[in-house]
């Protein structure tokens, strides 16, 4: 049984708030009753159930009910394309989709049975028994090819839930502000299962992240002031946007915040430092779906700048031939329809462990660039320097013309005017100046500027901001070809 479900059963009479969404408050007793009715509604349902919905109280109830029935649960992020959703439906053999009204078209194209999420609002008492042995299939958006299904059972999830709660000293007094999709495993664990286990409260506000994406960078600060959270999880781009908002407004983050965990992509050291100066207690971590989403995490009592923290207690993390490898209770059972995973997991990430056990991540093993003189460069090294500048939302270093390094730049709303000016040499000089501390051979020799909408349309990045490098290389080649043909 998941620890969160066990805790919910133990608190089924509690009138304390478990989840808040806008003006709706769901107490633990209400949540238990709603989950019980949803479990009854799933009687006779197929063995594999997919969930495609926006963050909401309905999402929470459906998640817990599917889990309680012991079925295989496939949460699907809203940002997946229709082709990806069709692929997942077939790959996981989803027998039933639960969906909200926004995603009717997405589930219809799969041709699979589907049911609109309807949560019973009944005064009739209901209870449920938990069927053990449920499985989650987490589809990673990935940076190449179709999403792969990572299989995680109760043991793997419970390890991560408990380890996260201990790492951040989670208590029933915590107020977790959720701005990322629950379909992302890290957000589901931190925003749903950890608060449930300790008896805390989760506040759902997906509008804030959407507002930031549309250019209103003050939305996170506004949400935090209104909700006074103690814990949040952000991707680096949202942390940078919040910092930019605070700098512009000359404000500080609410004093209620004690932990802002940051993951999903590399976070520039200077951004972490600036966040702290602005009252944002940002702690960078590292993980992957294949390891229950978390491998290492800086914490309030164990933090080191330039690292992603120490590995979670109970994990055996080693560097083998420069690559981070992991063994332990949260390592996946395997990929769907592949051989069961055994032994140590090679992450594909390059890294080191310092003398005090803090993990340092250098970048992806398969993303190393080689210049014309045979020099190896980890692009993440340069990209972190470029994205230190608030004018740059995202940056990717790739091969351009004649084997030279080309930076693909996605400006922020603040940086659009700078990059829109017709002065290529001045802009390139500014980019190279941001990388002043590295050798000349590692600096960008060229750059291409791409708007947020164009980058999204070309699907150049995952939702957490990780670059799809193969697609970006092809995109850059196409841009140069178009320029030649003009």
Regions found by a protein language model. Give the residues of each.
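Conserved ATP/PPi-binding loop(s) of AMP-dependent carboxylate-activating enzymes
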Residues: 307-313, 318-344, 358, 373-377
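Conserved C-terminal "lid"/linker of ANL adenylate-forming enzymes
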Residues: 369, 394, 433-486
């Amino acid at each position: 049984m998941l620890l969160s479900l066990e805790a919910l059963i133990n608190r089924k009479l509690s009138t304390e708030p478990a989840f808040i969404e806008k003006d709706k408050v769901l107490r633990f007793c209400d949540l238990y009753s709603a989950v019980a009715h949803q479990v009854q509604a799933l009687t006779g349902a197929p063995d594999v159930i997919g969930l495609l919905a926006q963050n909401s109280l309905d999402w929470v109830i459906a998640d817990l009910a599917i889990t309680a029935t012991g079925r295989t649960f496939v949460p699907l992020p809203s940002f997946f394309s229709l082709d990806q959703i069709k692929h997942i439906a077939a790959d996981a053999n989803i027998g039933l989709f639960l969906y909200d009204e926004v995603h009717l078209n997405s589930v219809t194209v799969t041709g699979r049975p589907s049911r609109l999420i309807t949560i019973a609002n009944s005064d009739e008492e209901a209870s449920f028994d938990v069927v053990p042995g449920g499985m989650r299939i987490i589809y990673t958006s990935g940076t190449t090819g179709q999403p792969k299904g990572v299989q995680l059972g109760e043991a793997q999830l419970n390890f991560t839930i408990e380890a996260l709660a201990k790492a951040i000293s989670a208590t029933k007094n915590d107020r977790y502000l959720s701005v990322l999709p629950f379909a992302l495993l890290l957000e589901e664990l931190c925003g749903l299962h950890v608060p449930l286990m300790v008896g805390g409260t989760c506040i759902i506000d997906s509008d804030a992240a959407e507002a930031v994406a549309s250019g209103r960078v003050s939305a996170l600060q506004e949400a935090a002031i209104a909700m006074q959270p103690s814990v949040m999880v952000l991707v680096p781009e949202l942390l940078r946007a919040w910092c930019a908002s605070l700098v512009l407004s000359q404000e500080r983050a609410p004093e209620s915040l004690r932990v802002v965990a940051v993951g999903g992509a590399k976070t520039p050291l200077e951004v972490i430092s600036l966040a702290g100066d602005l009252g944002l207690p940002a702690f960078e971590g590292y993980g992957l779906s294949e390891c229950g989403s978390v491998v290492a995490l800086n914490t309030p009592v164990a933090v080191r700048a330039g690292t992603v923290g120490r590995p979670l207690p109970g994990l055996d993390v080693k560097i083998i031939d420069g690559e981070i490898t992991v063994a332990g209770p949260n390592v996946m059972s395997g990929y769907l329809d592949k051989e069961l995973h055994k032994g140590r997991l090679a992450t594909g990430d390059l890294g080191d462990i310092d003398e005090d056990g803090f993990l340092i991540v250098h970048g992806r093993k398969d993303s190393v660039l080689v210049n014309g003189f045979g020099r190896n460069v980890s692009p993440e090294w340069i990209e972190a320097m470029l994205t230190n500048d608030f004018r740059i939302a995202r940056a990717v270093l790739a091969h351009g013309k004649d084997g030279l390094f080309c930076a693909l730049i996605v400006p922020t709303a603040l940086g659009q005017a700078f990059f829109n000016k017709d002065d290529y040499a001045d802009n390139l000089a500014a980019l190279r100046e941001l990388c002043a501390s590295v050798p000349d051979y590692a600096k960008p020799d060229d750059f291409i500027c791409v708007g947020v909408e164009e980058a999204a349309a070309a699907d150049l990045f995952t939702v957490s901001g990780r670059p799809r490098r193969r697609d970006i290389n092809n995109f850059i080649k196409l841009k140069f070809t178009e320029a030649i043909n003009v």
